[in-house]
Curated annotation (Swiss-Prot):
InterPro entries on file: Trp_synth_b_CS, Trp_synth_beta, Trp_synth_beta/beta-like, TrpB-like_PALP, TrpB-like_PALP_sf
CDD domains reported in the protein's UniProt record: Trp-synth_B
Pfam families to which the protein is assigned, alphabetical: PALP
Listed name of the protein: Tryptophan synthase beta chain
Length: 396
């Protein structure tokens, strides 16, 4: 029996080989103890402030919503050390690993952002680091691969399956099942077996807490909606967590529609998948008629995931959060618009959330609304991808 609730409604759980159950129980207990230990909280918050650069800014866009009555703020997780929201929870889990007496860290990464965040935390805290990464992602994210290596991490390309994030996840779990006595598996999103979805949410929830305080100070009221992209869902749950009880605030998650929801090239399991067991949890999953996991697709490597965190599945099921999808082309347009109109280059992941917010503003230009987009990461890692696409289209 788990000590914390392992399920969100019908979703979640702990579907892992028996050999991993003691490791997950140990992790759950360490997390419970750490949450009650003021010294742990103080060390974690200290690292976030002095090393990572929290709190991050809440920036009012000046030009993007001209011609509409929408006020659009960006929560600037792109300004965090490491370039994305990933740094928050990685520091928390790395401290937990040290607390459990483990000196090795295993991680998986898609876009490379979680890998970079894990590598920097391991360098800072003196932990050995090995990162599993789909061979395809190693190719399309070479700057991040080099960053990880610079900080002392070993990057292990995974060639099995589609050679993307889901395969890296499987290899990382396989490694951990043989090494958990000395190694901690530092999972990169709010998904996977319990207690990971809960741990990652709690180590990301400062995003929404800060946003709430900042918007109240600036506007004197809560936003009408907070909007975040959803792959596994950690940046979104970090933004949503502190607003779930605020019923006037719409929670909007944006999945990748890829080349179109009506094609087989998208990554939107929440709205277009079926419930299944994957990566140690029960959650919506992209699967074929035989129940085999289908490949997800997105121009953004960090959203290219065939499932989604169980709390998002639950929030969707009870109608508390709403989930929509944005295509590659719409995300690319938003990416370029933000760069040109505000001088901010967003991650392709975050561009999906931004594109949705721009639709909300432009579809109803006379509506006075206050929106916050979680700008979960910066776009340095994506400039080569975007350059190649625009070149192919003859757009540059």
């Amino acid at each position: 029996m788990t000590k914390l609730n392992a399920y969100f409604g019908e979703y979640g759980g702990q579907y892992v080989p028996q050999i991993l159950v003691p490791a997950l129980e140990q992790l759950e207990q360490a997390f419970i103890d750490a949450q009650e230990d003021p010294d742990f909280r103080s060390e974690f918050m200290g690292l976030l402030q002095e090393y990572a650069g929290r709190p991050t800014a809440l920036t009012l866009t000046r030009n993007l919503t001209k011609g509409t009555k929408t006020k659009l703020y960006l929560k600037r997780e792109d300004l965090l050390h490491g370039g994305a929201h990933k740094t928050n929870q990685v520091l928390g889990q790395a401290l937990l690993a040290k607390r459990m007496g483990k000196n090795e860290i295993i991680a998986e990464t898609g876009a490379g952002q979680h890998g970079v965040a894990t590598a920097l935390a391991c360098a800072l805290l003196g932990l050995k680091c090995r990162v599993y990464m789909g061979a395809k992602d190693v190719e399309r994210q070479s700057p991040n691969v080099f960053r990880m290596k610079l900080m002392g991490a070993t990057v292990i390309p995974v060639h099995s399956g589609s050679a993307t994030l889901k395969d890296a996840c499987n290899e990382a779990l396989r490694d951990w099942s043989g090494s958990y006595e000395t190694a901690h598996y530092l999972l990169g999103t709010a998904a996977g077996p319990h207690p990971f979805p809960t741990i990652v949410r709690e180590f990301q929830r400062m995003i929404g807490e800060e946003t709430k305080n900042q918007i109240l100070a600036r506007e004197g009221r809560l936003p009408d909606a907070v909007i975040a992209c959803v792959g596994g869902g950690s940046n979104a749950i970090g933004m949503f967590a502190d607003f779930i009880e605020e019923e006037t605030v719409r929670l909007i998650g944006v999945e990748p529609a890829g080349k179109g929801i009506d094609t087989d090239q998208h990554g939107a399991p929440l709205k277009h998948g079926k419930t299944g067991i994957f990566f140690g949890m029960k959650a919506p999953l992209m699967q074929d008629e035989n129940g085999q996991v289908e490949e997800s697709y997105s121009v953004s490597a960090g959203l290219d995931f065939p499932s989604v965190g169980p709390q998002h599945a639950h929030l969707n099921a009870i109608g508390r959060a709403e989930y929509d999808s944005i295509t590659d082309d719409e995300a690319l347009d938003a990416f370029q618009e933000l760069a040109r109109s505000e001088g901010i280059i967003p991650a392709l992941e975050s561009s999906h959330a931004l594109a949705h917010a721009l639709k909300m503003a432009r579809n109803n230009p006379e509506k006075e609304q206050l929106l916050v987009v979680n700008l979960s990461g910066r776009g340095d890692k994506d400039i080569f991808t975007v350059h190649a696409i625009l070149e192919e289209k003859g757009a540059i």
